Amino acid sequence: MIRSTTAKLGKRCATLRVRASPILRPLVATRCITNKADEVFTKLSDENDPKRDAFFNYSWGSWLVNDKQEKAKRVTKFSLEGLTDVLNEIYADSQQLAKTVKSNRIPAPNHKKNLIVTLPHNTMIKDLGTVNPNEKVRVIRMASIHEGKHHRIYKLDTNIDRSFVLRIPYALENGHVIESRLKSEVATMDFAHLKLGINVPKVYCYGVNALNPVRQPFVLEEFIEGKLLMRDWNPLVDDKKDSLPDDNLKSVVEQVSDLQSKLLSMQFNGIGSLYFSKDYERPGEPKKSVYDGESNPDLQGRWIIGPTAERVFWRKKSVLNKEALSKFLGPWSANEPLEVVKNTGLVEAENAKARLALKQADASPEAVDETTLSEQIVSFENLATVGPHLFDSGTTTIPNVKELLKPRLYHPDLDPMNIIVTAEGTPYLLDFEGSSVKPFILHNSPQFVAYDGPKIFDLQEDIPDYEKLVDSEKAQYEFMYKRTRNQFLWDSALNERNNKLISAVAPPVKLLRSPYIAAVERKSDDEYLLIDEALIQLAEVWEVFYKNGLVKDANYPLTFSKETLEKHANDLNAFHEKLISRPFAATQGWIPQDMFENLIKAGILVKESDSSYTVKTENLD
């Protein structure tokens, strides 16, 4: 009987096992919802067996609109035979490396003819172990352990008692975007481990398109056994009796802050994202050092700063071809720290223009109206206009502003959900997708602690007659207090580790970068309104900021008419009402699969003639 490694967690999962046979190798695929499992048998040699397809299909959720199309984008069918060949190839390489390379050397990445790239320093015998003579590496069991926003993760168990992780990105973007993302992510993980001393899963090899033996873009890496740090994170836990923060709460913040401190320890000579030198070659241009002072000859020239791979520059940009997109991606000089803000606005405006043109030509299936796209264009162009004026490198009002403007490594998923802690207590930072190099003053707080609501530092002192309030009101204030506390713990940890950078969390500095952060964190089409809101708030305080030396220009670069401000206020209120009144608006219509199926059974979700689903709120209890 096959048991799924994730069934006991109560989530949808899939496992697949290969049984050795002198004649054939049948595959046993297990899919389960909660604790129930079904077995499906298929021949390993039959790649076209439809029974196998279920193992590759997306299953962790459904969409109210365009469900079939969204799931089709997330199919991760790959060649099991090709994967087996790749595994045997890296083991063969390890034998050759043992004869030709000293174990303390760090060879350059090996770009192979079959379009996979191996990292030789991770594929030595000390890393992989050995295979018995005349034995081949075989995958004997596979489990789908995660279906994320951008990629799917499989665990591979082999006949040599070693497990691997296979990561396959969803085909949500154009091929050239996925290619750049993978190249940059692997290079950034390599840099984080070799140069910053951060524990990351060893990457053995990767392929950036479907022309390799796996027939999908992929990353093959080390499997890390342990527990997610998120298991120790309870953001709404009560303080201890002495009013000090809970020990587990503080421990999680400090562990994540330790990782951030290592990421921030290096100052770079440019702005963009990291790549291996061979992955970003510019003929005729002199190679620039990524950072100063490298003495290890194996690391000299290993990496280069290339176009940014930050998510805001590629997310939902499929209407822009490679040439159109590349104009906005950099890399940029360290002497132009605000170019990244300007180009964030420009690329979003260009994307909105292209989407609008398709909509006007009746050639777009998107469920977005022309008015929204037109107003997006104005918002993003306004951001591009304001961007270069946000910070003055010569100000003395912001302490250590020159340090804040220096490019440093930014990790968008610095989160307990992205950290595994081994049994020995060693934390590993997992997913580096979308990492970039940009001024620290433009880094936003990690989502697990970020809080921009009303600040409450002491319930008794900050809330008049707190003890007289009814329980429901107390609960609201307690929520605000705990969110304030968590953000304060994070800021305090930054101050302890990098006190020269603490000015970045000062309220005026946060307000100055807020339009940019709203653009970076935008998830839906309507959230351009949050960019507008931040730009309008800046307009209201710009004169005060100028008089106090925070900004260089006396006049705010934008003007807003009374009619514009009134329309914005109405639109913003309507947006918030939409979030409240329309279930699942905040997740863009995505619903976890177990909940989706239960809502259908309860008659709350009803399928319409166009295959979309409607929420029948009248059926809610």
UniProtKB/Swiss-Prot annotation:
Keywords (A to Z) from UniProt: Mitochondrion, Transit peptide
Domain of life, per lineage: Eukaryota
Transmembrane segments: none
Cysteines joined through disulfide linkages: none
InterPro entries, alphabetized: Kinase-like_dom_sf, Mito_inheritance_9
Coiled coil regions in record: none
Transit pept. (range): 1-40
GO cellular component, one term: mitochondrion
Cellular localization per UniProt: Mitochondrion
PANTHER family: ALTERED INHERITANCE OF MITOCHONDRIA PROTEIN 9, MITOCHONDRIAL (PTHR36091:SF1)
Family note: Belongs to the AIM9 family.
Name assigned to this protein: Altered inheritance of mitochondria protein 9, mitochondrial
Organism of origin: Zygosaccharomyces rouxii (strain ATCC 2623 / CBS 732 / NBRC 1130 / NCYC 568 / NRRL Y-229)
